[in-house]
Design a protein with these regions (language model features):
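Vicinal oxygen chelate
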Residues: 1-2, 33, 42-47, 52, ...
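A cross-kingdom feature marking solvent-exposed beta-strand/loop segments within repeated
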Residues: 6-7, 26, 31-39, 57-75, ...
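N-terminal beta-strand motif that seeds the catalytic metal site of vicinal oxygen chelate
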Residues: 1-18, 74-77, 129-136
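A structural feature that tracks compact, well-ordered secondary-structure segments
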Residues: 9-14, 52-54, 78-82, 89-90, ...
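Extracellular/lumenal glycan-associated surfaces
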Residues: 49, 72, 76, 83
Length: 136
C-alpha cells in the first residue's frame, strides 16, 4: 500500500463563519465548496493538502460528530492512494474495519476506517481521477 500524499484534514466546526475568518486571516483562500444533504464543506488549500471545514446541518448528526462543548475538532485525515482494494486488504488483515464498497464524492472514490478499530483516528482513503486504479 502506497500513500501518495495527505489530501486533506477534515475539521468539524460549530461556527463556520468564525472558522472561515480564522483561516482567511492566516492567508488561506477558499478553493472549492462541497455540499451534500448532511453538511457543507469548504476546502482551503495549503501546499499539497487542504483544510476541510465541515459544518453539519442536522443537530442530531452534529452531536454524534462533535460534543456540544467543542467549537471544532479534527475529525479525519484523508490520504490519496493508488488502489482502494489494496488499502482495504492490508487494513482488514490488521483488524481495521473499512467501509466497503467505495463510494463517490465529487470526482473521487473513497473508503473510511472505523475510528474504534484504527487507534481512535478516523482515516479516509481516496482515489482521484487519473490515479492508477480504484481497486473496486
Amino acid at each position: 500500500m502506497k500513500l501518495r500524499r495527505i489530501d486533506h484534514i477534515g475539521v468539524v466546526v460549530a461556527d463556520l463563519p468564525a472558522h472561515v475568518a480564522q483561516l482567511e486571516a492566516m492567508g488561506l483562500v477558499l478553493e472549492r465548496v462541497g455540499d451534500n444533504s448532511e453538511s457543507n464543506a469548504l476546502y482551503y488549500p495549503c501546499g499539497d493538502a487542504s483544510v476541510e471545514l465541515i459544518e453539519v446541518r442536522d443537530p442530531v448528526i452534529a452531536a454524534r460528530r462533535m460534543s456540544e462543548e467543542e467549537q471544532a475538532r479534527i475529525e479525519h485525515i484523508a490520504f490519496e492512494v493508488d488502489d482502494l482494494g489494496e488499502v482495504r486488504d492490508l487494513l482488514e488483515s490488521r483488524g481495521v474495519e473499512v467501509s466497503w464498497p467505495p463510494f463517490p464524492s465529487g470526482s473521487a472514490m473513497m473508503i473510511w476506517t472505523t475510528a474504534a478499530t484504527s487507534g481512535g483516528v478516523q482515516y479516509q482513503f481516496l482515489v482521484r481521477p487519473g490515479g492508477e486504479g480504484g481497486g473496486a
